[in-house]
Amino acid sequence: MAKKIIISNELRKFRFFANEMTQQQLAEKVGVSRQTIISIEAGKYSPSLELAFRIAEAFGVKINELFDYEVKETNR
């Protein structure tokens, strides 16, 4: 059996609680494009470790409060 890692995040929730920060505002704060933030929120793109830390720092939280991962076994 193969293992698949699924990374989930709470970006949308943290943006909402940060005075409804826009995707553009977060993107500018961490130095990426708005499209990158959209892709991360949608689970289509997993950020680099460095970017994940920059995003967590932007919200003043630890990385594990913002990102989580799950290992699933697949029948490959």
Which residues does each predicted region cover?
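Short, charged recognition helix plus adjacent turn
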Residues: 1, 67-76
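Residues within the helices of the helix-turn-helix
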Residues: 12-13, 24, 53
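Alpha-helical residues within the helix-turn-helix
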Residues: 17, 28, 57
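DNA major-groove recognition helix of helix-turn-helix/homeodomain DNA-binding modules
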Residues: 50-65
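A short, Lys/Arg-rich alpha-helix, primarily the initiator
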Residues: 1-18
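Short, basic-rich loop-to-helix N-cap that marks the start of a DNA-contacting helix
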Residues: 44-54, 75
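Residue-level signal for the short linker/turn that defines the boundary of a DNA-recognition helix
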Residues: 9, 20-21, 47-50
